[in-house]
Amino acid sequence: MSVLPFLRIYAPLNAVLAAPGLLAVAALTIPDMSGRSRLALAALLAVIWGAYLLQLAATLLKRRAGVVRDRTPKIAIDVLAVLVPLAAFLLDGSPDWSLYCAVWLLKPLRDSTFFPVLGRVLANEARNLIGVTTLFGVVLFAVALAAYVIERDIQPEKFGSIPQAMWWAVVTLSTTGYGDTIPQSFAGRVLAGAVMMSGIGIFGLWAGILATGFYQEVRRGDFVRNWQLVAAVPLFQKLGPAVLVEIVRALRARTVPAGAVICRIGEPGDRMFFVVEGSVSVATPNPVELGPGAFFGEMALISGEPRSATVSAATTVSLLSLHSADFQMLCSSSPEIAEIFRKTALERRGAAASA
């Protein structure tokens, strides 16, 4: 029996298997654990290691067959998950060999889409992040210097040098404040208050830069996906890039579960829809099913008449909607859009009449 189907079953279980494995690694560090319990935990680690070995074999076979390509990071994680514990078991005779199974921390990240996004965010925001980090370093040294000057005679054992004062500066800038080092003078306490406020501002800058970067990355991905969808719609294929950008910016995402009614016949319509994923069923005398790239509901925007058919989700469907207010703005700024919609409405009305 081929092991190739195993990968499809196993891939979602990376985190599920890693969790008990890492808990077993932690439990094996308890000094007074009985020998039987240690043996059971070691057996559990061996079972998980065997599962990871099968996954590695499946991945390599799929890659050799050409089914999977460009998965070097995933394969590297699979190789490390197998070889590192094996090498530790064979070469390290001490009970600490199980600690090397901590490499399984990488397994839940194997199929994650978060870290590629994080990498792009860090690359895009590198200049701003480096700038804030530089500011942090400057403030850190300045605070340590000030604390050294103010407190060195009062607490020479804690502020007797700038490196010693830097520990207090770090924990105070991060607003952690362990309490092991506290300024005794009035000037030192005023400095501590100012440093805490500065730390909040600096960490707020870091958080704001990363949050903005993630938001822009998600928006960029949505924009590209929506652009590809809109550009593939025959209705818009003759429009220029500038007009397409306006349309994409006006679209709003919506997900509808299977069987749900999207619009009913006779209802007033205030938007049209584009199908991104899934399919919808149009209840006409000759029922029609529309898939990705199709659109419906444009008649209500053009003529203002009620819905001419009931449309429901044949499967779970992702839609992009264009509201009437946005539609009117687009038509006023780009008359060619209004003309394209008008011609399409006439064609569909004629086709419906002939049917």
UniProtKB/Swiss-Prot annotation:
InterPro entries: CNG_cation_channel, cNMP-bd_CS, cNMP-bd_dom, cNMP-bd_dom_sf, Ion_trans_dom, Nucleotide_channel_N, RmlC-like_jellyroll. Residues 31-38, 151-161, 181-185 are periplasmic. Pfam families: cNMP_binding (PF00027), Ion_trans (PF00520). It comes from the Bacteria. The chain crosses the membrane at residues 13-30, 39-61, 75-94, 95-112, 130-150, 186-210. A motif (Selectivity filter) lies at residues 175-180. PANTHER family: CYCLIC NUCLEOTIDE-GATED CATION CHANNEL SUBUNIT A. Belongs to the potassium channel family. Cyclic nucleotide-regulated potassium channel activated by cAMP. This is Cyclic nucleotide-gated potassium channel mll3241. The lineage of its organism: Bacteria, Pseudomonadati, Pseudomonadota, Alphaproteobacteria, Hyphomicrobiales.
